[in-house]
UniProtKB/Swiss-Prot annotation:
The gene is GRF5. This is 14-3-3-like protein GF14 upsilon. Keywords: Cytoplasm, Nucleus, Phosphoprotein. It comes from Arabidopsis thaliana. Residues 243-268 are annotated as: Disordered. InterPro entries: 14-3-3, 14-3-3_CS, 14-3-3_dom_sf, 14-3-3_domain.
Length: 268
């Protein structure tokens, strides 16, 4: 079997796995595809399949971690130390899984995808992805490990931003998605609501001013991300009044291939 037909088969198997909601296998198939980029860069479809596969695998664990952390806080506030001890061990198991998933995609990005990227759009996509998965590590790591993950996130997002501002239109869904996640990083990880709001507002305003230039093919994705930027601005500017009232929303599944938006740590 030629490498071309093998790559084509793995892409098809990844699509089957997605339909069957077998996302761990979808990751495996797309990892095989990603390791062939030395001969030919991933297509937009392949890139999106890889992103969706990892997004679902990591998303399930992030949701589990938030639920368990919330229960841990409640048990701790009630003084149930025996339960807290059990929960900490269980949370540790989830964190091990999260670390393994993040390390997997980060290694793939560093060794194969980023070096092989030639187009500005691809570079921004992969650097944004690198920032995203370092951010997911920063969500649950503590101490020096959290600091390191946060610094790596900032470097990746800034590198992506430099290219996006120079080469992608303000309405481009990948540029908008980067602004969305970069602003979430400032808000959640660095606790800098001013920087978060400033970044989100600038991205939204710049996109609005060029909305009439938006092509039909990306209109839905771009306007949906713009709506999420606006929703977050509304939430963040009112959070002092009701800090635990609302969650920062996840992007709907239909634009997962473009972007994903983080949620805050569990409310007290």
């Amino acid at each position: 079997m030629s490498s071309d037909s093998s790559r084509e088969e793995n892409v098809y198997l990844a699509k089957l796995a997605e339909q069957a909601e077998r996302y761990e296998e979808m990751v495996e198939f797309m990892e095989k595809v990603a390791k062939t980029v030395e001969t030919e860069e991933l297509t937009v479809e392949e890139r999106n399949l890889l992103s969706v596969a990892y997004k679902n695998v990591i998303g399930a664990r992030r949701a589990s971690w938030r639920i368990i952390s919330s229960i841990e806080q409640k048990e701790d506030s009630r003084g149930n130390s025996d339960h807290v001890s059990i929960i900490k061990d269980y949370r540790g198991k989830i964190e091990t899984e999260l670390s393994k998933i993040c390390d997997g995609i980060l290694n793939l990005l560093e060794a194969h995808l980023i070096p092989a990227a030639s187009l500005a759009e691809s570079k921004v996509f992969y650097l944004k992805m690198k920032g995203d998965y370092h951010r997911y590590l920063a969500e649950f790591k503590t101490g020096a490990e959290r600091k390191e993950a946060a610094e790596s996130t900032l470097v990746a997002y800034k590198s992506a931003q430099d290219i996006a501002l120079a080469d992608l239109a303000p309405t481009h869904p990948i540029r908008l998605g980067l602004a969305l996640n970069f602003s979430v990083f400032y808000y959640e990880i660095l606790n800098s609501s001013d920087r978060a709001c400033s970044l989100a507002k600038q991205a939204f305003d710049e996109a609005i001013s060029e909305l009439d230039t938006l092509g039909e093919e990306s209109y839905k994705d771009s306007t949906l991300i713009m709506q999420l930027l606006r929703d977050n601005l509304t939430l963040w500017t009112s959070d002092l009044n009701d800090e635990a009232g609302d969650d920062i929303k996840e992007a709907p599944k239909e634009v997962q291939k473009v972007d994903e938006q983080a949620q805050p740590p569990p409310s007290q």
